């Protein structure tokens, strides 16, 4: 499938649906409350993530594709927090803020990797007049290549038929990840993406492939769909269209750690590819590959362009590619659970040269996984001067991601990655040059955790500064 690409130059996607804020409180539990027989959690850390339709938008943004998100929120602190979280990822938020309802929020309290309690703050939107939302949709939809309607049964899509008709009038394909058993309400959509359980709840038990195909085609006819994609867990996914052969894709997941949000990833990549002008077959292929990546991560996660490109071209050595700090912590936890030795290094890597290549190859040989932490553009500028970096962060990480020696990449904004190293706690911290181990940022944290620190030599004569000076001489 080398002709397929994860670069979506023309795509623009609009998402409308039930938006949520997922909050996580983490803490230690060492005693039982004297007030009631319940554990006392001393909260030490918290995290916020976009949920529901907002997670769909996050998936699209992670592919470097313009995305607008519409939905209903409250005029409250959580609505503001969700908007800020999304805007940081360059997602265009076009919400209707209600005085009468709170922003849907799910607060999870965890200790020792176990969820102790979930608190839901929500009221369904079935009694809300959605005329403002419909007006926003009608105004914006013509500017996008695909519309995703993300249904979590909270009421934002109570006028889903009107939404479908607005998109059809604008000749924009409508993709829906359905909720419940009333699929007739999605009549006229371009494509539905039910999982096998949702599909069988509507059409009845399917014991053979022939039954899946027959009942799927009947469903397409009954509710006037263009296509139906049934996601089937370990059996992959099956695309059905009238008068065309079924298109089946086996699963590409090597290891499954968590299926949370996999459906969001499938519909996000599918819509993005269709909006980019790809065929149904190519779009489903890319969505299937993306699903195989995301189920290998813990929690609600996204897939980057680099990860998708690597997976398409069968580059397993690059692992999960570019990650956030939270994603990296999950990936490291999984790798350590498998008994893998984690090596970590850091640098600017502004202009990659043979010295960098050999250094990273030597570092990789010291363990099973190599993490490379990369200075942000502002961090490089503070360290190297106003004329640096030559290459921006996105380009520097994209080049590093193509190296077989590099498993994971993570950016950091500080002058040193000391905080990041303290969070990741690799088994081995590596630095190139003439440092003493105790001078290396993060060494104390690694030693305190039982890890080791090692200094590697750079190749003589290889440096970014030398490369820049040679380029200046050529210009002169």
Curated annotation (Swiss-Prot):
Annotated keywords: ATP-binding, Carbohydrate metabolism, Kinase, Multifunctional enzyme, Nucleotide-binding, Nucleotidyltransferase, Transferase
Q: Which Gene3D superfamilies match?
A: 3.40.1190.20, HUPs (3.40.50.620)
Q: Hey, which pathway is this one from? A: Nucleotide-sugar biosynthesis; ADP-L-glycero-beta-D-manno-heptose biosynthesis; ADP-L-glycero-beta-D-manno-heptose from D-glycero-beta-D-manno-heptose 7-phosphate: step 1/4; Nucleotide-sugar biosynthesis; ADP-L-glycero-beta-D-manno-heptose biosynthesis; ADP-L-glycero-beta-D-manno-heptose from D-glycero-beta-D-manno-heptose 7-phosphate: step 3/4
One Gene Ontology molecular-function label: phosphotransferase activity, alcohol group as acceptor
GO-annotated biological processes = ADP-L-glycero-beta-D-manno-heptose biosynthetic process
**Cited InterPro entries:** Bifunc_HldE, Cyt_trans-like, PfkB_dom, RfaE_dom_I, RfaE_dom_II, Ribokinase-like, Rossmann-like_a/b/a_fold
Enzyme category, top tier: transferase
The record's region (Cytidylyltransferase) falls at: 344-476
What are the boundaries of the region Ribokinase? 1-318
Pfam families hit by this protein = CTP_transf_like, PfkB
EC number(s) of the enzyme? Answer: 2.7.1.167, 2.7.7.70
UniProt: ATP binding residues: 195-198
Per the record, what is one GO cellular component? cytosol
Q: What family does the database annotate? A: In the N-terminal section; belongs to the carbohydrate kinase PfkB family. In the C-terminal section; belongs to the cytidylyltransferase family.
Instruction: Provide the assembly information.
Output: Homodimer.
Q: What does this protein do?
A: Catalyzes the ADP transfer from ATP to D-glycero-beta-D-manno-heptose 1-phosphate, yielding ADP-D-glycero-beta-D-manno-heptose.
Q: What is this protein called?
A: Bifunctional protein HldE
Q: Which organism is it from?
A: Haemophilus influenzae (strain PittGG)
Give the gene that encodes this protein.
hldE
């Amino acid at each position: 499938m080398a002709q397929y690409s994860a670069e979506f130059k023309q795509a623009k996607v609009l998402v409308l649906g039930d938006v949520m804020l997922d909050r996580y409180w983490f803490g230690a539990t060492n005693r039982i409350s004297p007030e009631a027989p319940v554990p006392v959690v001393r909260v030490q850390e918290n995290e916020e993530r976009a949920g529901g339709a907002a997670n769909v938008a996050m998936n699209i943004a992670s592919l470097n594709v313009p995305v607008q998100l519409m939905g209903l929120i409250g005029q409250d602190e959580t609505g503001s927090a969700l908007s800020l979280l999304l805007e940081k990822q360059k997602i265009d938020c076009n919400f209707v803020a209600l005085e009468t309802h709170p922003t849907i929020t799910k607060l999870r309290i965890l200790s020792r990797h176990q969820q102790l309690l979930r608190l839901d703050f929500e009221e369904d939107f079935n009694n809300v007049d959605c005329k403002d939302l419909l007006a926003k949709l009608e105004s914006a939809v013509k500017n996008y290549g695909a519309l995703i309607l993300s249904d979590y049964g909270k009421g934002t899509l109570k006028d889903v038929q009107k939404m479908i008709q607005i998109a059809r009038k604008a000749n924009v394909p409508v993709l829906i990840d359905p909720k419940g058993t009333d699929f007739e309400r999605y009549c006229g959509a371009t494509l539905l993406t039910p999982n096998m359980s949702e599909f069988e709840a509507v059409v009845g038990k399917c014991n053979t492939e022939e039954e899946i195909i027959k009942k799927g085609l009947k469903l397409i006819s009954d509710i006037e769909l263009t296509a139906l994609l049934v996601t089937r867990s370990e059996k992959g996914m099956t695309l059905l269209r009238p008068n065309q052969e079924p298109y089946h894709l086996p699963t590409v997941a090597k290891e499954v750690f968590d299926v949370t949000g996999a459906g969001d990833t499938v519909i996000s990549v599918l819509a993005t590819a269709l909006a980019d002008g790809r065929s149904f077959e190519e779009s489903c292929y890319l969505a299937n590959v993306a699903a195989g990546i995301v189920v290998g991560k813990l929690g609600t996660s996204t897939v980057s362009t680099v990860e998708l490109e690597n997976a398409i071209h069968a580059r397993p050595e690059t692992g999960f590619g570019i990650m956030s700090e939270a994603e990296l912590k999950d990936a490291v936890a999984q790798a350590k659970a498998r008994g893998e030795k984690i090596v970590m290094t850091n640098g600017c890597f502004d202009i990659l040269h043979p010295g960098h290549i050999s250094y990273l190859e030597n570092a990789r040989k010291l363990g099973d996984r190599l993490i490379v932490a990369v200075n942000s553009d502002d961090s490089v500028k503070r360290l190297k001067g106003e004329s640096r970096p030559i290459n921006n962060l996105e380009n520097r990480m994209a080049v590093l991601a193509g190296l077989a020696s590099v498993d994971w990449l993570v950016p950091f904004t500080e002058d040193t990655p000391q905080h990041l190293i303290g969070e990741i706690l690799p088994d081995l911290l590596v630095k190139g040059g003439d440092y003493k181990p105790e001078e290396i940022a993060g060494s104390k944290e690694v030693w305190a955790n039982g890890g080791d620190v090692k200094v590697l030599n750079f190749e003589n004569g290889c440096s970014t500064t030398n490369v820049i000076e040679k380029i200046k001489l050529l210009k002169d």
